[in-house]
Amino acid sequence: MRHLILALILLAAPAAAAPLTGKSYIIELSSSQYASGYGNYLVPPLAAVMAKSGLTAETGPGADVVVNIVTNSDIGRWVGTGANKVWLYTISVTIGISPEAYAIPYEGTPAFGITAALETPNPDRQDEMECLITLAARTALKNYRPTGIFPVEGSSCKRR
């Protein structure tokens, strides 16, 4: 019985950010994010979350972990019928946390990440994107583990 209780306690305990305690990080952009200027929109909300994380920012190689951003958007689709028919896009943001030694592939897939997704009529809303980045970053820091990409519902980021 004690083993069952202990197992339930361990399973119920959230994955803590303890493995990240005392670590340093660097934010990495893809070459296309950097070259296009898209990083100017992506980095500020991520940097704000990271500044409050307790991790130490590094300005160059040698950080313990690499934090990256992967964005995605579909081409949209009609949803609803009649007067309620609207064209919606699904946008998503994955915030990744990878060990410095992990080689992030070209498409940006991190060792660990949280993907926040949202259906919206306008895929270019900066406020929704900032909210998704913040949500995914906070969730990733809170639930960090060595590997896996996990979803989080992003509908709270939809502009009302």
PLM feature segments, named:
Residues 63-111, 118, 122:
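Surface-exposed short loop/turn segments
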Residues 53-66:
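Short acidic low-complexity segments
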Residues 35-43, 86-88, 122-134:
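Solvent-exposed, acidic/flexible segments
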Residues 19-21, 61, 87:
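Solvent-exposed loop and beta-edge segments used for protein-protein assembly and interaction
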Residues 5, 27, 40, 80, ...:
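Intrinsically disordered, low-complexity regions enriched in small/polar residues
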Residues 27-29, 69, 133:
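Extended hydrophobic/Leu-rich segments
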Residues 18-22, 101-160:
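C-terminal/domain-edge helix-coil "capping" segments
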Residues 3, 7-54, 148-160:
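A structural "domain/chain start" motif
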